[in-house]
Amino acid sequence: LGDVYKRQILFSTDERTESGPHIRDSVDIKRVMILVVLSLIPCYVFGAINIGYQKSLTYGLETTWVENLITGLMTIVPIIAVTFMSGAFWELLFGVVRKHPISEGFLVTCALIPLTLPPAIPLWQVAVATSFGIVIGKEIFGGVGMNIFNPALMARAFLYFTYPADISGDKVWALAPDGYSGPTALSIPAGQVNANATDLLDTAS
């Protein structure tokens, strides 16, 4: 029993390996990060279609899935662009200051952040949240592999507590119109030429 007790996972063995226990192949951090980004593409496609579909429901329109996809892409592409530009700026800045190679980890972070944001969010908030998530959530801890928080969720949490009206609720997830325009009760008789007010009231009643 003593030998079994000593071989448990809480104790280390006194045996030493003669060769490296790791498999060395072409799959490095860059390859893994790119695969993660590529695996998120279906999520973006579905999200774009859903954004267009929700907008068509809001406006009471009948649209195809291709039209919904185009509408969604027109909405999320600016968000993605701002996210990647902000992330690349901070990654390059910290890489130059610390004199270390640029890591591809920010690609995954910048690919995840737009998936957590509503479609109608202001682009300046996207830039601020991305900067907060990468700088405070990752870079101050030393970069890729040393952060204790998820940078994408740090960006989401930052927006939730600083701009709750733009990040929470049901209305922010649909591209609703700012307002409706239509004739008012006073504009209808005002548009009549040579009309009698009494006759208009009698007609309306």
Stretches with model-predicted labels:
Residues H100-T109, A127-V128, N147-R156:
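Cytoplasmic-side transmembrane-helix entry/capping segments in multi-pass membrane proteins
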Residues L1-Y5:
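Short, small-residue-biased leader/transition segments that mark boundaries at the very start
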Residues T109-P119, I136:
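Generic transmembrane alpha-helix motif of multi-pass integral membrane proteins
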Residues T17-I23, G87-K99, I134-G145:
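C-terminal ends of transmembrane helices
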Residues V36-I49, F84-E91, L115, S131-I134, ...:
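Hydrophobic core segments of alpha-helical transmembrane domains in multi-pass membrane transport
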Residues G145-S205:
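Long hydrophobic alpha-helical segments that form multi-pass transmembrane helix bundles
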Residues P42-T109:
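Membrane helical hairpin/interfacial module
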Residues T13-V32, W65-L69:
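Cytosolic juxtamembrane amphipathic/interface segments immediately preceding
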